[in-house]
Design a protein with these regions (language model features):
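N-terminal Rossmann-like NAD(P)+-binding domain of SDR-like oxidoreductases, especially those catalyzing
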Residues: 1-123
Length: 123
């Protein structure tokens, strides 16, 4: 089956991705690598979920994530570095892939930021 997992680079999402891949499924991971958590941790989560070495040379967020997208792409896995609030990007993903199951795990974390930026959390 083809799974789309939002938030697939987070703690819970990356573990789900790992199990889905082990069970032979195709996984599309959509994650925006929000700054609440260190993006380097999410890169390591992603690498572990696709059974790749976590030895990764970090430079800067944008280039590191682009490198991760290319490095992890396979016949069973693809990572999209995008925000689920970007309707056009999501529409393109749905257009390009036959998705059987969507697992929505993406969420903005943190109580304090939710008070400071409530609209971001509502969207």
């Amino acid at each position: 089956m083809n799974y789309l997992v939002t938030g697939g680079s987070g703690f819970i999402g990356s573990h789900l991705v790992e199990h889905l891949l082990k069970d032979g499924h195709f996984v599309i991971n959509v994650d925006n690598f929000d700054d609440f958590y260190d993006y380097q941790v999410k890169i390591k989560n992603t690498l572990e979920s696709v059974q790749q070495s976590t030895d990764f040379e970090f430079s800067d967020k944008e280039n590191d994530i682009k490198k991760l997208v290319n490095q992890t792409k396979s016949e069973n896995y693809i990572l999209y570095y995008t925000d689920i609030r970007d309707k056009e990007a999501l529409a393109q993903i749905f257009k390009n892939h036959k998705i059987d199951v969507l697992v929505h795990l993406a969420a903005l974390a943190g109580v304090r930021p939710s008070i400071e930026r409530p609209i971001d959390y509502e969207e």
